[in-house]
Design a protein with these regions (language model features):
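Hydrophobic structural segments
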Residues: 1-256
Length: 256
Protein backbone atom coordinates (compact mmCIF):
# COMPACT_ATOMS: atom_id res chain seq x y z
CA UNK A 1 0.00 0.00 0.00
CA UNK A 2 1.29 3.44 -0.96
CA UNK A 3 1.87 5.88 1.88
CA UNK A 4 2.30 9.64 1.98
CA UNK A 5 6.00 9.15 2.67
CA UNK A 6 6.42 7.08 -0.53
CA UNK A 7 5.12 9.95 -2.65
CA UNK A 8 7.31 12.39 -0.72
CA UNK A 9 10.36 10.18 -1.37
CA UNK A 10 9.56 9.99 -5.10
CA UNK A 11 9.24 13.77 -5.37
CA UNK A 12 12.40 14.20 -3.32
CA UNK A 13 14.32 12.02 -5.77
CA UNK A 14 13.06 14.03 -8.75
CA UNK A 15 13.25 17.50 -7.15
CA UNK A 16 15.25 17.27 -3.90
CA UNK A 17 13.69 19.38 -1.18
CA UNK A 18 17.21 20.26 -0.01
CA UNK A 19 17.63 22.35 -3.19
CA UNK A 20 14.73 24.67 -2.32
CA UNK A 21 15.79 28.31 -1.99
CA UNK A 22 16.53 29.63 1.49
CA UNK A 23 13.31 31.68 1.78
CA UNK A 24 11.14 28.71 0.83
CA UNK A 25 8.99 26.35 2.89
CA UNK A 26 8.78 23.14 0.88
CA UNK A 27 8.16 19.56 1.96
CA UNK A 28 5.51 17.67 3.91
CA UNK A 29 3.70 20.62 5.49
CA UNK A 30 0.62 18.85 6.85
CA UNK A 31 -0.27 15.31 7.82
CA UNK A 32 1.43 12.05 8.65
CA UNK A 33 3.88 10.35 6.33
CA UNK A 34 2.62 6.94 7.44
CA UNK A 35 -0.94 7.51 6.21
CA UNK A 36 -2.07 5.28 3.35
CA UNK A 37 -3.00 6.93 0.05
CA UNK A 38 -5.48 5.89 -2.63
CA UNK A 39 -6.43 9.28 -4.09
CA UNK A 40 -4.25 12.37 -4.59
CA UNK A 41 -5.28 15.82 -5.79
CA UNK A 42 -2.75 18.07 -7.57
CA UNK A 43 -2.93 21.86 -7.51
CA UNK A 44 -0.78 24.93 -7.94
CA UNK A 45 -2.14 26.39 -4.68
CA UNK A 46 -3.84 24.76 -1.70
CA UNK A 47 -6.80 27.08 -1.31
CA UNK A 48 -9.88 26.35 0.81
CA UNK A 49 -11.75 25.39 -2.38
CA UNK A 50 -9.01 22.92 -3.31
CA UNK A 51 -9.15 21.33 0.14
CA UNK A 52 -12.95 21.06 -0.06
CA UNK A 53 -12.61 19.41 -3.48
CA UNK A 54 -10.06 16.98 -2.06
CA UNK A 55 -12.41 16.12 0.79
CA UNK A 56 -15.35 15.62 -1.58
CA UNK A 57 -13.41 13.18 -3.77
CA UNK A 58 -11.96 11.28 -0.82
CA UNK A 59 -8.34 12.34 -1.35
CA UNK A 60 -5.88 11.62 1.43
CA UNK A 61 -3.16 13.90 0.03
CA UNK A 62 -2.77 17.14 -1.91
CA UNK A 63 0.47 17.75 -3.81
CA UNK A 64 0.92 21.43 -4.63
CA UNK A 65 3.55 23.76 -6.00
CA UNK A 66 3.05 26.72 -3.66
CA UNK A 67 3.42 26.10 0.09
CA UNK A 68 0.17 26.01 2.03
CA UNK A 69 2.12 27.50 4.95
CA UNK A 70 4.63 30.15 3.85
CA UNK A 71 4.49 33.26 6.00
CA UNK A 72 4.20 32.68 9.77
CA UNK A 73 0.63 31.75 10.74
CA UNK A 74 -0.98 34.53 12.77
CA UNK A 75 -4.44 32.96 13.02
CA UNK A 76 -6.10 29.64 12.29
CA UNK A 77 -9.77 29.90 11.36
CA UNK A 78 -12.34 27.38 10.10
CA UNK A 79 -12.31 28.84 6.59
CA UNK A 80 -8.52 28.64 6.17
CA UNK A 81 -6.75 25.95 4.16
CA UNK A 82 -4.54 24.69 7.05
CA UNK A 83 -7.60 24.32 9.31
CA UNK A 84 -9.51 22.44 6.60
CA UNK A 85 -6.57 20.12 5.95
CA UNK A 86 -6.49 19.18 9.62
CA UNK A 87 -10.27 18.88 9.86
CA UNK A 88 -10.43 16.45 6.93
CA UNK A 89 -7.15 14.67 7.82
CA UNK A 90 -5.65 15.47 4.42
CA UNK A 91 -1.87 15.60 4.08
CA UNK A 92 -0.06 18.26 2.02
CA UNK A 93 3.25 17.97 0.18
CA UNK A 94 4.44 21.24 -1.35
CA UNK A 95 7.24 21.20 -3.95
CA UNK A 96 8.05 24.84 -4.65
CA UNK A 97 11.43 26.26 -5.72
CA UNK A 98 12.94 22.77 -5.72
CA UNK A 99 10.48 21.90 -8.51
CA UNK A 100 11.26 25.16 -10.34
CA UNK A 101 14.93 24.20 -10.46
CA UNK A 102 14.60 20.46 -11.13
CA UNK A 103 15.25 18.89 -14.54
CA UNK A 104 11.81 18.21 -15.97
CA UNK A 105 10.33 20.70 -13.50
CA UNK A 106 8.40 23.92 -13.92
CA UNK A 107 10.84 25.80 -16.16
CA UNK A 108 11.41 22.75 -18.34
CA UNK A 109 7.66 22.35 -18.80
CA UNK A 110 7.31 26.04 -19.64
CA UNK A 111 10.03 25.75 -22.30
CA UNK A 112 8.27 22.72 -23.79
CA UNK A 113 4.90 24.48 -23.85
CA UNK A 114 6.48 27.41 -25.71
CA UNK A 115 7.91 25.00 -28.29
CA UNK A 116 11.57 25.78 -27.61
CA UNK A 117 14.37 23.55 -28.89
CA UNK A 118 17.96 23.19 -27.68
CA UNK A 119 16.87 24.10 -24.14
CA UNK A 120 19.80 24.90 -21.85
CA UNK A 121 20.65 26.86 -18.67
CA UNK A 122 20.57 30.64 -18.91
CA UNK A 123 21.57 31.38 -15.30
CA UNK A 124 22.44 29.27 -12.26
CA UNK A 125 21.12 29.32 -8.69
CA UNK A 126 24.44 29.44 -6.77
CA UNK A 127 23.50 27.41 -3.65
CA UNK A 128 22.09 24.45 -5.58
CA UNK A 129 24.13 24.71 -8.78
CA UNK A 130 20.89 24.17 -10.73
CA UNK A 131 19.55 26.41 -13.51
CA UNK A 132 17.17 29.10 -12.22
CA UNK A 133 16.42 30.24 -15.78
CA UNK A 134 16.51 28.43 -19.12
CA UNK A 135 16.76 29.46 -22.75
CA UNK A 136 16.06 27.85 -26.09
CA UNK A 137 15.26 28.50 -29.74
CA UNK A 138 11.99 29.00 -31.56
CA UNK A 139 11.55 27.13 -34.86
CA UNK A 140 11.51 30.49 -36.67
CA UNK A 141 12.06 34.11 -35.71
CA UNK A 142 9.05 36.21 -34.70
CA UNK A 143 8.47 39.91 -34.31
CA UNK A 144 7.97 40.95 -30.65
CA UNK A 145 4.19 41.30 -30.85
CA UNK A 146 3.87 38.02 -32.75
CA UNK A 147 5.93 36.30 -30.07
CA UNK A 148 3.80 37.79 -27.28
CA UNK A 149 0.70 36.40 -28.99
CA UNK A 150 2.44 33.03 -29.31
CA UNK A 151 3.03 33.00 -25.54
CA UNK A 152 -0.57 34.03 -24.88
CA UNK A 153 -1.92 31.21 -27.02
CA UNK A 154 0.53 28.58 -25.80
CA UNK A 155 -0.29 29.27 -22.15
CA UNK A 156 -4.01 29.94 -22.72
CA UNK A 157 -3.80 33.37 -21.07
CA UNK A 158 -6.54 35.99 -21.14
CA UNK A 159 -3.86 38.64 -21.59
CA UNK A 160 -0.10 39.20 -21.55
CA UNK A 161 2.01 42.33 -21.18
CA UNK A 162 5.17 42.82 -23.21
CA UNK A 163 7.87 45.28 -24.08
CA UNK A 164 8.85 45.67 -27.72
CA UNK A 165 12.45 44.63 -28.06
CA UNK A 166 14.78 45.91 -30.74
CA UNK A 167 15.23 42.63 -32.64
CA UNK A 168 13.18 39.72 -33.97
CA UNK A 169 12.83 36.93 -31.41
CA UNK A 170 14.54 33.60 -32.05
CA UNK A 171 16.32 32.81 -28.76
CA UNK A 172 14.05 32.94 -25.70
CA UNK A 173 14.92 32.99 -22.01
CA UNK A 174 12.43 32.11 -19.29
CA UNK A 175 11.88 31.82 -15.57
CA UNK A 176 8.41 30.87 -14.34
CA UNK A 177 6.51 32.76 -11.66
CA UNK A 178 8.18 35.86 -10.22
CA UNK A 179 11.26 35.44 -12.39
CA UNK A 180 12.07 38.91 -13.72
CA UNK A 181 15.16 38.96 -11.48
CA UNK A 182 16.70 36.55 -14.02
CA UNK A 183 16.12 38.91 -16.95
CA UNK A 184 19.23 38.83 -19.18
CA UNK A 185 21.03 41.47 -21.23
CA UNK A 186 20.42 40.56 -24.89
CA UNK A 187 23.85 41.88 -25.86
CA UNK A 188 25.75 39.44 -23.63
CA UNK A 189 23.32 36.51 -23.49
CA UNK A 190 22.20 36.24 -27.10
CA UNK A 191 18.58 36.18 -25.90
CA UNK A 192 16.08 38.46 -27.64
CA UNK A 193 13.06 37.74 -25.40
CA UNK A 194 12.37 36.67 -21.83
CA UNK A 195 9.16 35.10 -20.51
CA UNK A 196 8.11 35.22 -16.88
CA UNK A 197 5.00 35.43 -14.74
CA UNK A 198 5.50 38.77 -12.99
CA UNK A 199 7.49 41.95 -13.52
CA UNK A 200 7.61 45.26 -11.67
CA UNK A 201 7.31 48.59 -13.46
CA UNK A 202 11.03 49.33 -13.18
CA UNK A 203 11.82 45.89 -14.62
CA UNK A 204 9.64 46.61 -17.65
CA UNK A 205 11.46 49.92 -18.08
CA UNK A 206 14.81 48.15 -17.78
CA UNK A 207 13.82 45.59 -20.43
CA UNK A 208 12.75 48.33 -22.81
CA UNK A 209 15.98 50.25 -22.25
CA UNK A 210 18.16 47.28 -23.23
CA UNK A 211 16.05 46.27 -26.24
CA UNK A 212 14.66 43.07 -24.69
CA UNK A 213 11.20 41.72 -25.46
CA UNK A 214 9.92 40.93 -21.96
CA UNK A 215 6.66 38.96 -21.92
CA UNK A 216 4.75 38.87 -18.62
CA UNK A 217 2.22 36.04 -18.84
CA UNK A 218 0.99 35.69 -15.26
CA UNK A 219 2.30 33.74 -12.29
CA UNK A 220 -0.33 31.03 -12.54
CA UNK A 221 -0.06 30.47 -16.28
CA UNK A 222 3.73 30.14 -16.30
CA UNK A 223 3.65 27.55 -13.49
CA UNK A 224 0.46 25.51 -13.96
CA UNK A 225 2.15 23.89 -16.98
CA UNK A 226 3.97 21.57 -14.56
CA UNK A 227 0.83 19.91 -13.17
CA UNK A 228 0.30 17.46 -16.09
CA UNK A 229 3.96 16.42 -15.80
CA UNK A 230 3.61 15.81 -12.06
CA UNK A 231 0.48 13.74 -12.68
CA UNK A 232 2.15 11.69 -15.41
CA UNK A 233 5.24 10.91 -13.36
CA UNK A 234 3.32 10.04 -10.21
CA UNK A 235 0.80 7.91 -12.12
CA UNK A 236 3.60 5.85 -13.65
CA UNK A 237 5.37 5.43 -10.31
CA UNK A 238 2.18 4.59 -8.34
CA UNK A 239 -0.34 2.99 -10.73
CA UNK A 240 -2.50 1.86 -7.82
CA UNK A 241 -3.14 5.50 -6.80
CA UNK A 242 -5.53 7.89 -8.56
CA UNK A 243 -3.96 11.28 -9.36
CA UNK A 244 -6.03 14.16 -10.71
CA UNK A 245 -5.59 17.90 -11.19
CA UNK A 246 -7.99 19.91 -9.05
CA UNK A 247 -10.78 21.68 -10.90
CA UNK A 248 -10.44 24.42 -8.27
CA UNK A 249 -6.79 24.99 -9.20
CA UNK A 250 -7.06 28.22 -11.19
CA UNK A 251 -5.75 31.75 -11.43
CA UNK A 252 -7.41 34.14 -8.98
CA UNK A 253 -7.24 37.05 -11.44
CA UNK A 254 -9.49 38.03 -14.34
CA UNK A 255 -8.92 40.33 -17.30
CA UNK A 256 -11.41 42.88 -18.62
Amino acid sequence: MTKVKNIYEFLNEWAPFSTAMSFDNAGLLAGNGEEEVQTVLLALDITPDVVREAASCGAQLIVSHHPVIFDPLKRLTPDSAPWLLARHAIAAICAHTNLDLAPGGVNTCLAARLGLANVRPLSIDPPSGLPEALCGELPAAMEPREFALHVKNALDCERVEFTKGSAPVRTVGLCSGAGAFCMPDPQTSGVQAFVTGEAKHHELLAAESIGLTLVVAGHYHTEAVVLPEVRERLSKAFPEVTFSIAAASRTPSHAV
